[in-house]
Amino acid sequence: MNRWAGRILGGLGVLVLVGGAGLVASRVWGDRVAVVRIDGVITEGRAPSFWNEGSGAAESLAELSSIRDKRQVKAVVLRLNSPGGSAAASQEIAREVEGLRAAGKKVVASMGDVSASGAYWIACSADRIVADPATVTGSIGVITRVPQLGSLYRRMGIEEEVVKSGKYKDMGSPGRPLTGDERRIFEAMVGDVYGQFVDQVAGSRHLPATRVRELADGRIFTGRQGVEAGLVDSLGTMGDAVRMAGSLAGIKGKPQVVEVRQGGWWPRGDKGQERPAGGESTWRLPGGVMLMMVPVTG
């Protein structure tokens, strides 16, 4: 009796394991909308650290590239909750999004609390942009900061000697002010990246560059103001963005949704519902002092 019971239970165990795997597969694979989240300050490489929340370009690029060849994924929602960050990292992520579109996938950018500057640059690479009415967006512009710590060094008795191969090799050193030539070099660099940003917005939003420059003075907009200015397509929630993505991709009925993250794909619920708002409604700047010596959007 015990022997037969063991066999029956063993058989049930196999059924449960196989059936369970089939259930998960049926929920994760098929015609899907994938959600990729970009949260916090956008940085080059990997996210800053365990303590400093942000989106590293390496992680975001890996997540996006993992979708490109997945035939079951017909559309992507970019959930953006970021004040911006590195200009180069923002460009790299935007290019990867454009690659998804070239591969035939529809992409909708969904803006959370904040989707400004570098995050807006990324949003412009999508087919559609959806924002909440109170979303903070815009901030189209470029900034670089050169800290001046010379007086602090002197008070602390710190002196430095510089040996350099060329007159500009220590350009931006915190121990001394910029020279006139150095300032002009920085201004030209910022101006060049700014022009690239304007071109990205003008091309994707089908706006004249002159109009974009009127808006691109660093000012921020609410989501509703963004729609009026032509920077955002429509107002709506993340759920609205998911439904829009599914519709653009020709998915019948309510789309099933998977979250794409480093280490795997995760179903977002039997009906593709959102996670509680508290899980996606905040962003934090990295702690400590950041000394940015390259153009950054933020």
Map each language-model feature to its residues.
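Active-site loop architecture of trypsin-fold serine endopeptidases
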Residues: 134-142
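N-terminal organellar transit peptides
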Residues: 1-117, 124, 128-131, 143-298
